[in-house]
Amino acid sequence: MAGLSVPSPFLLTLALLLLLFLLIYISPLNQNHLTLHFSPSSTTALSPTLTYPQTSHKTQAQVSPASSPAEAESFLDSPPFSISTDNPSSHIPLSRNIKKRSKTEKIEEDLARARAAIRNAIRLQNYTSDREETYIPSGCVYRNAYAFHQSHIEMVKRFKLWVYREGEKPMVHCGPMSYIYSIEGQFIDEMERGDSPFLAQRPDEAHAFFLPISITKIVDVFYRLDPWHFPMLPIFTDYVNVVASKYPYWNRSSGADHFMISCHDWAPEVIKKDREYFKNFIRVLCNANTSEGFIPTRDVSLPEYNLKGAAHGDIRSLLFEHWKQKDNEIQVYENLPKKKNYHKLLGESKFCLCPSGSEVASPRVVEAMYQECVPVIISDYYTLPFSDVLDWSKFAVFIPPRRIPELKTILKGISERRYLTLQKRVKQVARHFELNRPAKPFDVIHMVLHSVWLRRMNIRLPQNDY
């Protein structure tokens, strides 16, 4: 008669340990690398994957991508939000029993939780929030509505900025509040007023760092002294050097978690003298021209406001040449007649032409949306605002400058049904271009911050005891 075999205590203990290990390994919190591969809607064919350069030549800090730069397995229909998991040994553990976690580790663990929440939202096609949501993104205007919504929830819940306090007005801590560069000053003022929920109490709590220096104000001050813009370059670099020498944060990341904002045409030139030093630095720019060094995976395209339509730039000159006051259906004015109301004209129009001027951006994009007019983007090399999450092809029309002579034929070829669909979607996305003070969820200031938030989630800081 066979005897009853009883497992030894050693084997039971070993089995329990193995089961515990498997539970920890497959936990969503351990899978902390969410890589957001951007392929912005641009008037040029761009489909880059995010691979951040390593360090600046002036520091030794190692800034890593949040996951392997290899092409990730995509869980989505469109590329901007895709997930990849790299070697588990490179993951940042969410609990350490051996030693006390550094503040940098705590920050990175916080971002890991955000990535896990976004991953779950994509997988479950739902969102998780601890507060009532005032708006639920949905529909094809978003590259992935679930990813965007959960990402915005995580940003509101977690994202903290440190605004450097060094420097004095008028070049620092303020910017233009009206006219063509107004978004620059409005954003700086929102961050400077001190009541934004995104502001960190201490710099060591911050996920990202804002340099509140205004390129427009620098130009205003120094252009009168020397009507040439290169003297402004060392002013910006000097400011960065001041905060880099006073705090450890720039050198820790080689500038990868730092950003500036500017709507001035000359803003892209501030890094020209030392591209290596600024190669990781996030620039939030209206002049988002990929042919002039704008990198969609690193930089952020900023919507421009408040346009007056004088002829400047080759594209507008070409537009005036072919269509200026030549057709009742294609109304193109260099200077609007006194009896005409600009915003009324936009509101009465089906399609609003948004040509580039001397630089690629056009404020008419925003104005068209306010009037529920379908924007017609006429530009080369322009990375459109918020194209990390918005699919511009679903609510705008794109016409390359070389086809301006065919403008009427192209627009006439759009059926009434297609036009009404585009217009309905314009109304849906218009909320993302509204400027509110104080900022509100999903408005333009939140969208700018969300663009920075995405880029911050795509890097991993070195684990030093800062």
Regions found by a protein language model. Give the residues of each.
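Catalytic binding pocket for nucleotide-activated donors in carbohydrate/polymer assembly enzymes
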Residues: 341-434
